[in-house]
Amino acid sequence: MYFSILQLPFLIYPVFGNFDFTGYTMVSKIAGAALLLAIMSNFALADCFDRAGSYYSIDPDYLRAISWQESRFNNAAINGKSAGGTTDYCMMQINSRTLADLRREYPSLNKDKLYSSPCLCIHVGAMLLRRNFNKYGLSWLAVGMYNAGMSNKQTSIQNRYNYAMLINDHYKKIKAGIIQRPHIE
């Protein structure tokens, strides 16, 4: 069965709602539901950086910038050459000493879980950055402490500053599209 273009508005009315011939716009419950679904799916489509950023009130591109600096978004990354003989795990390079401290609060948290769940790794990194912000304020000092720790030695102070400036540079490149945002579930 074929329909002319003039018959189309009458055919879609029962399904989609009212059709306004003057503005050629359609008002319907289905269109509203589709809009709501599209808005809701943005959160469902959000990757782990977006969800962790939202949960910890941190711009997710800062989390991406840290992950880029620490591992180039590689969740299998490991660094066994950290200061004090510690090891850093997963894409957010969670330090083994920090992980041991976190196990007091989260006994089941371990390096295997960080490696098997990139999203968990991102959330742990976001939590650590949020704790730095809560303790030291929303500052580059807090960002620098993510990597260089809290020591007040001159080299640590310089390392914190250098790290923070690297993160800021990566952040700008992510915003500009020079560093591509990965979609990590």
Language model segments and positions:
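Sec-dependent signal peptide recognition
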Residues: 4, 27-36
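Cationic, low-complexity basic patches in intrinsically disordered or flexible, solvent-exposed regions
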Residues: 8
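Catalytic glycan-binding domains that act on GlcNAc-containing polysaccharides
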Residues: 45-185
